C-alpha cells in the first residue's frame, strides 16, 4: 500500500515537472521568480484574481526548483479560490500536498481544499457530492492538525456540513412518506438518528420514525422512538407532536 502511494506521488511529481516544460513557449522570456511572485501579489491586492493566478503559475512553470515556488503554488490556489474557480484550486492543492507534504503551510493547504468544497455545498434537493468532500476534508484537517488554528474553524464548519447532510436525508425521507412508502422512509430517518444525532434534524427524525412505524402498524417500535424523543428532547416541539400521534 505504501509502495503504491509512493509510486503515485512520483507519477504526480513527474507529470507536474514535465508540464512545466510544455507550458513554456519557445519564445517566452524567463522572468525572475521573485519578480513574478511580486507581480502576482500586486494583481491579487488589486482584485485581479485570475491574473494573479497566472503570475503565480508562471513561478511554478519557470522555476520549479526555486525556494519560493511552493508558496507561489499556495497563492495560485488561493487566487483561484477567490476567483470562484474552486475545482482548479482543489487540483492545485492536490498536487501541492503530494509535492510538499512537510511544508510549513501544509495545514493551510488541506484547509483551503476543504473550504473549496465547502463553499460549493448545494441545496439539499440537489447532489451532495461536494458536501461529502467538504465533510471528508474538514475531518482531515481536524485529524491531521488538531492544534492548528484551522482546526477550530474546521470543527465549526463540520457541524454545519453534518447538519446539511442530515437535511438531505430528511428531505428524501419526507418524500418517501409523502408517497406512502414508510419502509424506505425509515431507512433515511435512521441514518439521521444514528449518524447525525447531534444535528438540529434529530428530533424530527425521531418523530418521523414514530410516524413511519405507526403507518406500518408497529406500535411498540413507534413507542420506543417516542421514549427516546421524550428523554432526549423533552421540551422540543416534535416531542409534543409525537404525544398527539400516540393518543
Model regions and ranges:
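Acidic, polar-rich low-complexity tracts and alpha-helical solenoid repeat scaffolds
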Residues: 3-4, 16-247
Amino acid at each position: 500500500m505504501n509502495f503504491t502511494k509512493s509510486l503515485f506521488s512520483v507519477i504526480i511529481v513527474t507529470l507536474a515537472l514535465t508540464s512545466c516544460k510544455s507550458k513554456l513557449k519557445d519564445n517566452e522570456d524567463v522572468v525572475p521568480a521573485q519578480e513574478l511572485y511580486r507581480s502576482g501579489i500586486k494583481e491579487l491586492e488589486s482584485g485581479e484574481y485570475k491574473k494573479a493566478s497566472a503570475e503565480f503559475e508562471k513561478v511554478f512553470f519557470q522555476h520549479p526548483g526555486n525556494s519560493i515556488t511552493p508558496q507561489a503554488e499556495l497563492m495560485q490556489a488561493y487566487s483561484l479560490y477567490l476567483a470562484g474557480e474552486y475545482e482548479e484550486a482543489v487540483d492545485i492543492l492536490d498536487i501541492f500536498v503530494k509535492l510538499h507534504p512537510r511544508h510549513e503551510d501544509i495545514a493551510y493547504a488541506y484547509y483551503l481544499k476543504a473550504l473549496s468544497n465547502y463553499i460549493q455545498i448545494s441545496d439539499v434537493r440537489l447532489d451532495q457530492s461536494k458536501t461529502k468532500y467538504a465533510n471528508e476534508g474538514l475531518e482531515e484537517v481536524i485529524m491531521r492538525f488538531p492544534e492548528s488554528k484551522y482546526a477550530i474553524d474546521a470543527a465549526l464548519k463540520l457541524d454545519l456540513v453534518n447538519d446539511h447532510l442530515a437535511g438531505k436525508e430528511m428531505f428524501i425521507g419526507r418524500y418517501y412518506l409523502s408517497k406512502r412508502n414508510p419502509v424506505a422512509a425509515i431507512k433515511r430517518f435512521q441514518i439521521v438518528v444514528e449518524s447525525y444525532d447531534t444535528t438540529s434534524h434529530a428530533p424530527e427524525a425521531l418523530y418521523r420514525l414514530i410516524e413511519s412505524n405507526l403507518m406500518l402498524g408497529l406500535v411498540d417500535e413507534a413507542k420506543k422512538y417516542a421514549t427516546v424523543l421524550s428523554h432526549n428532547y423533552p421540551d422540543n416541539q416534535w416531542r409534543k407532536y409525537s404525544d398527539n400521534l400516540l393518543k
